Amino acid sequence: MKRVYSIKSKNELDLVFKEKKSVGNGYFVIYFIPHETPHFKYAISIGKKFGNAVERNQAKRRLRYIVSNYSNYINPKYRFVIVVRPQSNLLPYDLIKENITKLLIKAKLIEKEAQN
C-alpha cells in the first residue's frame, strides 16, 4: 500500500476525530469522514495497553494488509481511522478480517459485494 493512502499529519487526524461518524464492535472502532480527495486515506491507532511493541506492530501489519486487500473497493471519498481495542489482542487473523470487513460494510466504506 502506498504511503499516499496514510494519514500523516496531526491536523488530518484531529479533523477525523473532531467531525467523526463512527461504527464499532468490541474489538475495533472505525471513525470516518467524507472528504474530497482522489483516493481514501486511513490511519491505525493502537494504545499502549495492547500488549508489547511486537504485538502492536503485528496488529498494525495485519490491519494494513486487510485494508490493502480492499483498496480497490473502498470508497475514495473518505478518510478513516481504525482504533484497535485491547480485547482484539487474542483474535486470530481470520476473525480480525471478518470484524474489519463487517465494520467497513456497516460504515458504507465498501459495498457488500466486495467482500472477499
Curated annotation (Swiss-Prot):
Enzyme class per UniProt: hydrolase
Gene Ontology cellular-component annotations: ribonuclease P complex
Single annotated GO MF: ribonuclease P activity
Catalytic activity: Endonucleolytic cleavage of RNA, removing 5'-extranucleotides from tRNA precursor
Keywords: Endonuclease, Hydrolase, Nuclease, RNA-binding, tRNA processing
EC numbers: 3.1.26.5
UniProt xrefs under InterPro entries: Ribosomal_Su5_D2-typ_SF, Ribsml_uS5_D2-typ_fold_subgr, RNase_P, RNase_P_CS
Pfam families: Ribonuclease_P
Disulfide bond residue pairs: none
Record family assignment: Belongs to the RnpA family.
NCBIfam families: rnpA
Subunit organization: Consists of a catalytic RNA component (M1 or rnpB) and a protein subunit.
HAMAP family the record matches: RNase_P (MF_00227)
Function: RNaseP catalyzes the removal of the 5'-leader sequence from pre-tRNA to produce the mature 5'-terminus. It can also cleave other RNA substrates such as 4.5S RNA. The protein component plays an auxiliary but essential role in vivo by binding to the 5'-leader sequence and broadening the substrate specificity of the ribozyme.
Protein known as: Ribonuclease P protein component
Organism listed in the record: Acholeplasma laidlawii (strain PG-8A)
Lineage: Bacteria, Bacillati, Mycoplasmatota, Mollicutes, Acholeplasmatales
